[in-house]
Amino acid sequence: LNGKISDIADPALLKDGQRLVDILAKKIADKAKIRIIGDYDIDGVMSTYILVKALKRAGACVDYMIPDRVKDGYGLNVHLIDKAYEDGIDTVVTCDNGIAAIEEIAHAKELGMTVLVTDHHAVPFEDIKGIKIYKESKADAVVNPHQIECSYPYKELCGAAAVSYTHLTLPTK
């Protein structure tokens, strides 16, 4: 309750944070269509709101989808990717989901799409004789403090905080 701004860790420590910003900056400059796919809980909605506002302020051609819990289920799925592709979307960015969407991201990549993941959930793994083998997607950038290679000190960020790096570092139009 009595924190200071200096108590916040440097968001540049988030693995792939700068890569994600660089990709988005290029997509904005190229006038590429970007779709944010959030989650239906409050963290997903706020994450989506933060990122849509940041991208619009930077001059992006951006829209968003919040999946229907009953119809679409949780997170990124093939139906949402196919819909984005049909709509001429170049880049899909997830908010508060995507870390476990290995096959779905592979599908988007096969369609030639750029995929950026912002998430805070645990990285999926396979346990082989007591050894955790972490699963990785073919996303172009993944911002998630739970990644093994991520040096961000606060692993329990919410999804909205995981998109904060983009919000803080994208240029404004």
Question: How would you label these PLM feature ranges?
Answer:
Residues 169-173:
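A short, hydrophobic C-terminal helix/tail in secreted or cell-surface proteins
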